[in-house]
């Protein structure tokens, strides 16, 4: 197996196959569930809006892939600093049956100098998730934070507040995951000594098998080749799947999605 084939198979099994569009429908989510079951293995999860969780759960069970996890988003995509709303949305997502919640960090508050609200918001959501055995990923929106110091700070605050994963981006801003921001965030995981318990998720902008290979190489360099399993690494993407499947000898690499 070539290096690109090997990394593509790894990446496919680490994907949170995503649809987070305003025009999402039950039919589109059902199609996403079908796509998550591939000829070479299943994606780790799907990521959808909360209202679609019940139909996704039913579809995944019916197609014989109940182990594909269901992730959803809260405080999304703007990362407002209203803790009560973020917590209410997170509790609602848990009630819908989410296995994982990707909450947006109040990044604009951090840019304005307020570190406390980010900690408090993540901690409140973490407490709700922990009580329900739900995984919490925190989206820090690196493309809006821009500066290394802010990316580092948001990562540190999120981890201290209990994040199970730190995630680069919503996919809804001009700049999403980059290798540079990925390295900074994974260096924080390393430097804080939390690589056993905290994972990393690049999202948005990882579109090709070659992109995925680059992002995995950074993880392998920092943590060794065994670290990036589905408990420690995910790709938030949709168009990536077609490229990975093409690299693995399935399909033409074309995707209907841009995330």
Curated annotation (Swiss-Prot):
Keyword Cytoplasm in record: yes
Residues at the catalytic site: 102, 167, 201
Alphabetically ordered keywords of this record: Cytoplasm, Lyase, Schiff base
Its EC number(s): 4.1.2.4
Pfam family for this entry, one: DeoC
GO BP: 2-deoxyribose 1-phosphate catabolic process; carbohydrate catabolic process; deoxyribonucleotide catabolic process
Enzyme class, spelled out: lyase
Molecular function terms from GO: deoxyribose-phosphate aldolase activity
Domain of life (superkingdom): Bacteria
Main location: cytoplasm
Location(s), subcellular: Cytoplasm
Subunit (UniProt): Homodimer.
Entry similarity comment: Belongs to the DeoC/FbaB aldolase family. DeoC type 2 subfamily.
Entries under PANTHER family matching the protein: DEOXYRIBOSE-PHOSPHATE ALDOLASE
Function comment: Catalyzes a reversible aldol reaction between acetaldehyde and D-glyceraldehyde 3-phosphate to generate 2-deoxy-D-ribose 5-phosphate.
Protein name in the entry: Deoxyribose-phosphate aldolase
Source organism of this protein record: Salmonella typhimurium (strain LT2 / SGSC1412 / ATCC 700720)
């Amino acid at each position: 197996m070539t290096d690109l084939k090997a990394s593509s198979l790894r990446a496919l099994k680490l994907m949170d196959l995503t649809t987070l569009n305003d025009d999402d429908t039950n039919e589109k989510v059902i199609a996403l569930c079908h796509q998550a079951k591939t000829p070479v293995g299943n994606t780790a999860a799907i990521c959808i809006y909360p209202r679609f969780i019940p139909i996704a759960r039913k579809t995944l069970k019916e197609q014989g892939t109940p182990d594909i996890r269901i992730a959803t988003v809260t405080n999304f995509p703007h990362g407002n600093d209203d803790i009560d709303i973020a917590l209410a949305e997170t509790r609602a997502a848990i009630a819908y049956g989410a296995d994982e919640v990707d909450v947006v960090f109040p990044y604009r508050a951090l840019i304005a100098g307020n570190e406390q609200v980010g900690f408090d918001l993540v901690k409140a959501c973490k407490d709700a998730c922990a009580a329900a055995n739900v995984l919490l990923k925190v989206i820090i929106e690196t493309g809006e934070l821009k500066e290394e110091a802010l990316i580092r700070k948001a990562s540190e605050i999120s981890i201290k507040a209990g994040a199970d994963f730190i995630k680069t981006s919503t996919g809804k801003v001009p700049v999403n995951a980059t290798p540079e921001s990925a390295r900074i965030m994974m260096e924080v995981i390393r430097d804080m000594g939390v690589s056993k318990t905290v994972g990393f998720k690049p999202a948005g902008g990882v579109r090709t098998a070659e992109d995925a290979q680059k992002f995995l190489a950074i993880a392998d360099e920092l943590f060794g080749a065994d670290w990036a399993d589905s408990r420690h690494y995910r790709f938030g993407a949709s168009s990536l799947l077609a490229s990975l499947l093409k690299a693995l000898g399935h399909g033409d690499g074309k995707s209907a999605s841009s995330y």
